[in-house]
Amino acid sequence: MNIKNQKPKGKMVLRTLAMPADTNANGDIFGGWIMSQMDIGGAILAKEIARGRVVTVSVNGMTFLKSVSVGDVVSCYAHCIRTGNTSITIKIEVWIKKVSSEPLGKFYCTTEAIFVYVAVDEFGQPKTLLPFSII
């Protein structure tokens, strides 16, 4: 696929603004903050699928494609790629829109990864997923 024709995959699960407090020593947005936003967004979708509590058990293939700047609008898109007996595997993409730095208005993918969540009961023990239709 031509990168100019690329669009986010999945549904928007989180949208926020990159702030100065989220920068690293170089002035770019800290990768750990981006990963945290991805985990929050992915957990929202996983909770909908599990119909309850979930915990993150792994992050695979975290790829940072481009840096994120202060003032960028950060959006996390997620879609379920697999479910197991208790686990939910979700592909998450971070897309940013430049609103306060050049090139203004540009919208592109900056980060992607696969997160695995496990449904848990009130005691934190794995819980079997109920049948569902993927959201």
Curated annotation (Swiss-Prot):
InterPro entries: Cytosol_ACT, HOTDOG_ACOT, HotDog_dom_sf, Thioestr_dom. Coiled coil: none annotated. Its EC number is 3.1.2.-. One of its GO terms (biological process) is acyl-CoA metabolic process. Transmembrane segments: none annotated. CDD domains: BFIT_BACH. Keywords: Hydrolase. The keyword Hydrolase applies. Pfam families: 4HBT. GO terms for molecular function: long-chain fatty acyl-CoA hydrolase activity. GO terms for cellular component: cytosol. Residues 8-123 form the HotDog ACOT-type domain. Belongs to the acyl coenzyme A hydrolase family. This is Uncharacterized acyl-CoA thioester hydrolase bbp_254.
